[in-house]
A protein has these predicted regions:
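Electropositive polyanion-binding surfaces
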Residues: 1-283, 293, 308, 314, ...
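Surface-exposed acidic, glycine/proline-enriched linker/cap segments
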Residues: 284-305
């Protein structure tokens, strides 16, 4: 179906779509002003054949519709959380505590090496989410963006479910819950049950006591299951990428250096696949790791590999058990 055919089919709804887009932009702007933090990491879209083998990998592209749904979803979650907080009934909130002060100081010290700064509350080592937001805006498009974004994310505490409404640091809001996906998340389903009982006038003292008894364990168990699901998703994605690159051993690709460590350099390809060139496979010189600038430097030649640098690689091998991909520099890169 072509674009024009789609436009004709939904012609009556088009004005509403544009109104939704306008409202979503206002909501996003409002969240940004209060300091909401958006870690925009590239996501992978992996296409599989009937046997579950990966046949294509590409970056997942967000569009206007994606943003509209997200903005409306966030508002619905905030509204429901605030409404039921003031009703003073047992509930399951989605909370995100303030970052650990030590991790914030470590982040501040690290980004200082690259000329970036965040304002930390004196004496308490606390940071406002707006400072993290400003940092992410500053590094956007810079060579250090991926590294600093990952380190900033690691300095944050993990969001969790709780019966206490303690606020959400990342969204810079006081009230938040997960309400919009009862078909795939248990906390949402639990919330819908509470709402239905309240709407139907059945949330009497006996039912309130029931929820008071079970919701703490519901929140704890849901948080634990979420962590397990996230870990499984990450491991599965890594495995599918390894399987995808297995049939491409010996092929060359252009990529960008996404990480530098004492043991090698990581290179990310345009399709989001990442592999490592071990330091022992950097030929032509003895390379050492310059920690303060995250660079790999040749002792004799002074040749330098740094974050954001474009390089051409050859897929050297994969390890399905370790879920790792090994690259080597393409011959033309070594000759430079």
């Amino acid at each position: 179906m072509g674009d024009q055919e789609v436009a004709n089919r939904y012609e009556k709804l088009t004005p509403m779509f544009f109104l939704m887009k306008k409202l979503a932009d206002l909501l996003r702007s409002k969240r940004k002003k209060r300091g909401s933090v958006d870690f925009d990491f590239p996501e992978s879209k992996i296409l599989l054949d009937k046997e579950g083998r990966p046949i294509k990998i590409m970056p997942y592209e967000r569009n206007a519709a994606t943003n509209i749904i997200e903005d409306f979803m966030l508002l619905a979650n905030e509204t429901v959380a605030q409404h039921f907080y003031w009703m003073e009934v047992p509930f399951v909130y989605r909370t995100h505590d303030k970052p650990d002060p030590d991790k914030i100081m470590q982040l501040a010290a690290f980004i200082n090496n690259f000329g970036y700064h965040i304002k930390v509350k004196s004496g308490e080592n606390e940071v406002h989410p707006k400072e993290i937001q400003k940092l992410l805006a500053e590094i956007e498009g810079r060579p250090q963006e991926a590294l600093i974004s990952r380190l900033a994310l690691r300095s944050m505490k993990r969001a969790r479910y709780s019966t206490e409404c303690t606020g959400h640091f990342g969204l810079a809001c006081q009230y938040y819950c997960h309400f919009t996906s009862p078909i795939r998340r248990y906390p949402d389903l639990q919330i819908h049950r509470i709402i239905k009982e309240q709407l139907r006038g059945r949330l009497k003292e006996e039912r309130i006591q029931h929820y008071q008894e079970i919701l703490t364990e519901v929140a704890k168990h849901s948080s634990e299951m979420e962590r397990r699901a996230d870990d499984a998703e990450r491991e599965t994605e890594k495995l599918k990428k390894v399987q995808y690159m297995k049939s491409r051993i010996g092929q060359s690709f252009e990529g960008v250096i996404s990480g530098v460590t004492a043991w090698g350099i990581y290179v990310e390809l345009p399709d989001t696949v990442e592999g490592m060139i071990h330091v022992s496979r950097l030929y032509g010189d003895f390379y050492f790791y310059r920690e303060e600038t995250y660079e790999m430097v040749g002792r004799d030649t002074g040749k330098c590999f740094k974050l954001g640098q474009k390089v051409k690689i050859v897929v050297d091998g994969v390890d399905e058990l370790q879920k790792s991909i090994d690259f080597v520099l393409a011959p033309e890169e070594e000759d430079q």
